[in-house]
Amino acid sequence: MEQRHLGRTGLRVSRIGLGTLTWGRDTDEHDAADVLKTFWEAGGTLVDTADVYGDGGAEYLLGRLIEGLVPRRDLVISTKAGSVPDPDRRFDGSRGHLLSALDASLTRLGTDYVDVWHIHAFDPGTPLEETLQALDLAVSSGRARYAGVSNFCGWQLAKAATWQLAAPGIRTRLASTQLEYSLLQRGVEREVLPAALDLGIGLLPSSPLGRGVLTAKYRNSTPPDSRGASEHLAPFVAPYLDDTASRIVDAVQTAADGLAVTPLQVALAWVRDRPGVTAPVIGARNAQQLTAALSVEALSLPDEICRALDDVSAPVHRYPDHDWSTL
């Protein structure tokens, strides 16, 4: 699998990442082992997790698998901290919480470092410089090799990255940012992606298949074994089952038919090759799903197909998102 630099750093990662959102919950150890081995054998390196996935079960399961199944040195492990199960405070970006969470992640993963450590979300209740200091301490102590953020909007990302570049002392520049990005969700193109490109921050799109909807499996009904049929994941899929999404899925299906490939391959290739994208993160629940996704490695979409998909899925950009002179 082709490797790409993560932002403006020397770290290289596979251009498709493996997500573990369902590990330890909907994906058991047997399926997770098959998925990880398939990913590794295909040349995949980037494995993304978080301390809240499966209430820590995803990290624990990944740690068990890298003990004997896949060499730790062959993987680029990314995890996240900051989300908390508190209805009154969804995110905790305090230095104390973040560093404690990182230590707990390392214990579950059975490793003394992670390759990339992300702040899971912006915490308005904590000064940003305190949150960023946790990144500096994690890297300077050797517990993390690189650092990034997740779910930061444009101004939050720009402020964080600029602080790390300009503040006095030894600071850790942001290597990456992780947000949802697909043909069904192009909101990052308004401000986040331009900021990331300008600041040399690699984008790791989550849900690049539109929460599974862009595979076209929901066109006629909800498959009983899908996330849309899962009690706790159905609300996650539901926003992308409207008429607007249906038109985009139809266009993806048409493109796939014309290229003799699958809708999954078209949707994944589109986001993988967008400017600024380092590696979309896919959440395959079994090896069969992963193999289907990895088959996109040899596919590059023709320009005319990209333009057609761009047009049908184009987000609404108004002032001041675009230069006023073009409006």
Per-region residue spans from a language model:
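N-terminal binding-site loop/beta-alpha segment at the start of enzyme catalytic domains
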Residues: 1-75
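Beta/alpha (TIM)-barrel catalytic core signal, keyed to glycine-rich beta->alpha loops juxtaposed to Asp/Glu
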Residues: 128-312, 327
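Conserved beta-strand positions
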Residues: 18, 49, 79, 116-119, ...
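N-terminal small/glycine-rich loop or linker at the start of catalytic domains
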Residues: 7-23, 78-90, 113, 118
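Active-site mouth loops of central-metabolism enzymes
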Residues: 20-30, 84-99, 120-126
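Short, acidic/polar
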Residues: 27-39, 93-109, 157-161
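Phosphate/pyrophosphate-binding loops at sites that engage ATP/ADP/AMP, CoA/4′-phosphopantetheine
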Residues: 70, 103-112, 260
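Active-site groove signature of glycoside hydrolases
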Residues: 106-125
